[in-house]
C-alpha cells in the first residue's frame, strides 16, 4: 500500500515513514457497479482513493434527474473538502463500474497534513482543482449542447486518454443535457469525423476540432457586462 500511495498526488509529498503510517490505517473495499459508497448529507469520516474502477459523485435534482459533478478515475483522491471542514458529504459517491476504493480516516489524514506542510499544500491544490471543475460545470448551463458535450469529452480525455469509457447516459448526466440530445450531438460529431463511438465508449479522433467548438464567438447583438473593481488608496495585494 505504501508503494502505491507513493505514486499518487498528494501522498507522494509525504516521507516514506509518514506514508507507511498512513498505509497501516487504510482500508480497501470493493463495490459492485451501481453500489453507493456514501450519500450526500452523511457525516464525513474519511478521504477516499480509487484503486481500480471509476466512481461518480452525483446529486439528485428536484425533477428526479441526476447531475454528475465529478468523475473519479483510478488513482484519484476525492472528498478532501469534508476532510478539511468536517462537514457532511456534499454528494453521493457511486461506483460507476466494479471498483476498489481505499478509505483513509479523517483523523489519519489530518495527522498527515499537520506533520507535512507540503502534503497539506498539495491537498489544498487538489481541492481547488475540484472546485474549478464544479465552477466550470456551473458555467456550462449557458452554453449550447454541442459546446457542453465537447467540453465534457475533452475534460474526460485528460483522465482516460483518447478513448472515454462512458455511456451516453453518463455523458448526459455530466453535461446536464438529455440522453436524446447527447446521442443526437454525438452522432453529429461522428458524421463530422470528430469522434468514433462504440457501445459505452467514445474515441476522440480530432480533438483540436472539438476544442475549436469551444471558441465559437458569441452571437451578434449579445451583450457583455464588465464590472470594474477599484481598490482603496494605499491597498497592496498579498
Named regions from a protein language model:
Residues 34, 45-58, 73-75:
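Glycine- and acidic-residue-biased ligand/ion/polar-headgroup-sensing regions
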Residues 96, 114-179:
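Polybasic "coupling" helices that flank or enter modular domains
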Residues 68-125:
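Cyclic-nucleotide recognition modules
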Residues 1-33, 77-78, 82-83:
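Cyclic nucleotide-binding regulatory module and flanking cytosolic helices
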Residues 36-42:
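Short phosphate-coordinating micro-motif centered on Lys-Gly-acidic
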Residues 188-189:
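Basic amphipathic alpha-helical segments that dock to polyanions
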Residues 193:
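Glycine-centered, phosphate/nucleic-acid-interacting loop/turn motifs that mediate DNA/RNA or nucleotide
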Amino acid at each position: 500500500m505504501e508503494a502505491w500511495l507513493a505514486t499518487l498526488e498528494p501522498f507522494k509529498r509525504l516521507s516514506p515513514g509518514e506514508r507507511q503510517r498512513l498505509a497501516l490505517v487504510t482500508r480497501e473495499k470493493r463495490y459492485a457497479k451501481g453500489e453507493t459508497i456514501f450519500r450526500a448529507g452523511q457525516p464525513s469520516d474519511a478521504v477516499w482513493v480509487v484503486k481500480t474502477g471509476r466512481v461518480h459523485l452525483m446529486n439528485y435534482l428536484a425533477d428526479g434527474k441526476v447531475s454528475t459533478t465529478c468523475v473519479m478515475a483510478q488513482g484519484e483522491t476525492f472528498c478532501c473538502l469534508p476532510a478539511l471542514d468536517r462537514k457532511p458529504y456534499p454528494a453521493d459517491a457511486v461506483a460507476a463500474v466494479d471498483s476498489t476504493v481505499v478509505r483513509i480516516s479523517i483523523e489519519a489524514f489530518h495527522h498527515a497534513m499537520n506533520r507535512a506542510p507540503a502534503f497539506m499544500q498539495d491537498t489544498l491544490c487538489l481541492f481547488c482543482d475540484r472546485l474549478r471543475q464544479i465552477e466550470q460545470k456551473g458555467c456550462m448551463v449557458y452554453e449550447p449542447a454541442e459546446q457542453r458535450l465537447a467540453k465534457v469529452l475533452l475534460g474526460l480525455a485528460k483522465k482516460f486518454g483518447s478513448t472515454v469509457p462512458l455511456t451516453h447516459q453518463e455523458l448526459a448526466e455530466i453535461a446536464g443535457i438529455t440522453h436524446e440530445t447527447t446521442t443526437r450531438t454525438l452522432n453529429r460529431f461522428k458524421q463530422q469525423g470528430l469522434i468514433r463511438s462504440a457501445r459505452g465508449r467514445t474515441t476522440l479522433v480530432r480533438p483540436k476540432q472539438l476544442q475549436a467548438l469551444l471558441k465559437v464567438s458569441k452571437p451578434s447583438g449579445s451583450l457583455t457586462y464588465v464590472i470594474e473593481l477599484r481598490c482603496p488608496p494605499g491597498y497592496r495585494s498579498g
